[in-house]
Amino acid sequence: IITSAVVLLMLLTSSVKVSAQTHKPDDILGTWLNQEATGKVQIYKEGDKYFGKLVWLRTPLDSITGLPRTDKENPDVKLKSSPLIGLVNLKNFTFDGKDQWSSGTIYDPKNGKTYKCYIEFESANKLKIRGYVGISLIGRNTFWTRSIN
């Protein structure tokens, strides 16, 4: 019985994610490729807050106009003509002191909506981005991979 308990304890502790490791606040900085490989976001720091902006799109030009793609789904009419490249879509994240960047928002230019969000490492070069409405149980995850260029 003791052997079974020891084996179970070893299995449980060995399956802890990389995110259980303590990260430094600036570990998140850099350029990240989104899950669909259609865009890259550069995460940067201003003061003690973290932000992200679109720096690359697989399809940077509008298929109809041939001009740079714009934020056409934005609910603010004044922003619909803003270019997607350079758009700040991650705002006001703070590091919790251990493993999570939280209290921020993520803007989805595909639907023009902004969601509460937190970010944590899934593995050394992979972020888990959790966007949600209200409470984090009602939301979805997406995973971004660190980009080397």
Language-model segments: which ranges?
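Short polar/acidic secondary-structure junctions
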Residues: 109-111, 120, 133-136
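N-terminal helix-cap/turn-to-beta initiation motif at the start of protein domains
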Residues: 19-31
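Bacterial Sec-dependent N-terminal signal peptides
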Residues: 1-22
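Edge beta-strand at a domain terminus
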Residues: 124-126, 133-149
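Generic beta-strand structural signal
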Residues: 45, 95, 121-122, 146
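Short, compact, well-ordered microdomains
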Residues: 117-127
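Short beta-strand segments that buttress and anchor functional surface loops
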Residues: 31-34, 102-109, 129-131
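Central antiparallel beta-sheet cores of small beta-barrel/beta-sandwich binding domains
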Residues: 37-108, 114-116
